[in-house]
UniProtKB/Swiss-Prot annotation:
Belongs to the DTD family. Disulfide bonds: none annotated. PANTHER family: D-AMINOACYL-TRNA DEACYLASE 1 (PTHR10472:SF5), D-TYROSYL-TRNA TYR DEACYLASE (PTHR10472). An aminoacyl-tRNA editing enzyme that deacylates mischarged D-aminoacyl-tRNAs. Also deacylates mischarged glycyl-tRNA(Ala), protecting cells against glycine mischarging by AlaRS. Acts via tRNA-based rather than protein-based catalysis; rejects L-amino acids rather than detecting D-amino acids in the active site. By recycling D-aminoacyl-tRNA to D-amino acids and free tRNA molecules, this enzyme counteracts the toxicity associated with the formation of D-aminoacyl-tRNA entities in vivo and helps enforce protein L-homochirality. A motif (Gly-cisPro motif, important for rejection of L-amino acids) lies at residues 137-138. It catalyses: glycyl-tRNA(Ala) + H2O = tRNA(Ala) + glycine + H(+); a D-aminoacyl-tRNA + H2O = a tRNA + a D-alpha-amino acid + H(+). This is D-aminoacyl-tRNA deacylase. InterPro entries: Daa-tRNA_deacyls_DTD, DTD-like_sf. SUPFAM superfamilies: DTD-like (SSF69500).
Length: 148
């Protein structure tokens, strides 16, 4: 499971011109599910995201997590995080999980992160989405569950 995490001042996602998820200060999380991912990957990734100290204290040091600041989280599915561009010019997505299983794990990820008590919003799995992000920093971090 792979997540691209961006610290944001605000972020929202639209489908067919309608806002389906919107947050203020917190994290935008693009989530990709890889073949072979399990609930253990969800546990590790959620724990890392919730406790990652990427919010600054008064001295400008990364001291606080999204939990500490009681921030908000927008989770958007993105299978293209598993693009392979080694051959040719068209990316291959062979490493990405099949849609049915990917949706199941994505929903479990969202449920797990909601257990934090923070406001959590989402896009719509499998939909063509327009994502609007006001980066804060910018701070962008890529985390792969198999590397933590």
């Amino acid at each position: 499971m792979r997540a691209v995490i961006q610290r944001v001042k605000k972020s929202w996602v639209e489908v067919d011109g309608k806002v389906v998820g919107s947050i203020n200060e917190g994290l935008n999380v693009f989530l990709g599910v890889r073949k072979g991912d399990t609930e253990e990957d969800i546990e590790k990734l959620v724990n890392k995201i919730l406790n990652l100290r990427i919010f600054e204290d008064e001295r400008g040091k990364f001291q606080y997590s999204v939990l500490d600041i009681k921030g908000e989280i927008l989770v958007v599915s993105q299978f293209t995080l598993y693009a392979n561009v080694k051959k040719g010019r068209r990316p291959s997505f062979e490493e990405a999980e099949e849609p049915k299983r990917a949706k199941e794990l994505y929903e479990k990820f969202v449920d797990k992160i909601k257990e934090s008590g923070l406001k959590v919003e989402t896009g719509i799995f499998g939909a063509m989405m327009d994502v609007f992000i006001e980066n804060w920093g910018p701070v962008t971090i890529i985390i792969d569950s198999r590397e933590i």
